[in-house]
C-alpha cells in the first residue's frame, strides 16, 4: 500500500489531497498527531508539521497503518516564480539548512517517480503554461527509511491554489500508485544545475529513472563513500554523469564509488541516445 503525506499548512499539498479524495471512498480517522484517510487503493496522512521537518514520520505513521512507500504532496517555492511540476528525493549533501540532518539521505522511490513522470507527461497539454522538471536531492526530511519522493507544484501561491494544476498532479499520482511496471533502469545522477535539465530529459524520454541526484553545487561535499551510500539507498545499477559539468576530480570520485558499489558509469549523452523509450 502506498501512502500520500501532506501538511496541514501546505496550500499545494492540501489542493492535491482534495483532488485525491475524489478518486475513492475514504474512511477518516484522527490518530495521534495525524488525520488519516483510508481507501482500498491507497492511504493519505495529513500532518501539522512542515514536510521538510518531518524526520521519522514513516516510523510514527507505522504505529497506525501498514504501508510500503511515501509520496509527499507539496508546494515548491522559488524566487523566479516559474510555473512548474517537480519531483525529487529529499536529503542533504552537506549542511542541513532546510530540515533533515547533515550528510544524510532519505531512501528514494525511483520506480514510482518514473511512473508518475510518464503519467504527468501525458497531461501536460492541459496546463501548457507549466513545465515539468526534475530537481536534485535537497532539503529534509532525510531520516526516512521507507522509499519516498516529493511531488510538487511551483512556485508561488497562485500555482499552489490552481485547482486544475493540482488535479493534473493528483491524477498522475494515482496512475503511479496503480502502475505495475517496476523494472525501469535505476541510476544515481551526478552533475548539472538544481533543475537537472539532462536528468529531466532522461526521465521523460528513456527507460531510466533516478534515485538521488547531486548538482554541481554539491561537489565540494561529495565523496566516494557518500556516493556509494546514495547508490545503495537508490538500489541503483548505474551512475549517470552530466559530462558537461563533471570535472576530472569528480569523475575520479564517481569511478571509485562505481567500483566499490559494483555499478556502471554512463554519460547522459549515451543514455539519451541508446535507451530511448519505444
From Swiss-Prot:
GO terms for biological process: D-amino acid catabolic process. Keywords: Hydrolase, Metal-binding, Zinc. Binds 2 Zn(2+) ions per subunit. InterPro entries: Deacylase_DtdA_archaea, DtdA. Its EC number is 3.1.1.96. D-aminoacyl-tRNA deacylase with broad substrate specificity. By recycling D-aminoacyl-tRNA to D-amino acids and free tRNA molecules, this enzyme counteracts the toxicity associated with the formation of D-aminoacyl-tRNA entities in vivo. It comes from Archaeoglobus fulgidus (strain ATCC 49558 / DSM 4304 / JCM 9628 / NBRC 100126 / VC-16). Belongs to the DtdA deacylase family. It holds the Pfam family tRNA_deacylase. Monomer. PANTHER family: D-AMINOACYL-TRNA DEACYLASE. It catalyses: a D-aminoacyl-tRNA + H2O = a tRNA + a D-alpha-amino acid + H(+); glycyl-tRNA(Ala) + H2O = tRNA(Ala) + glycine + H(+). Gene3D superfamilies: AF0625-like. Its cofactor is Zn(2+). This is D-aminoacyl-tRNA deacylase. GO terms for molecular function: D-aminoacyl-tRNA deacylase activity; zinc ion binding.
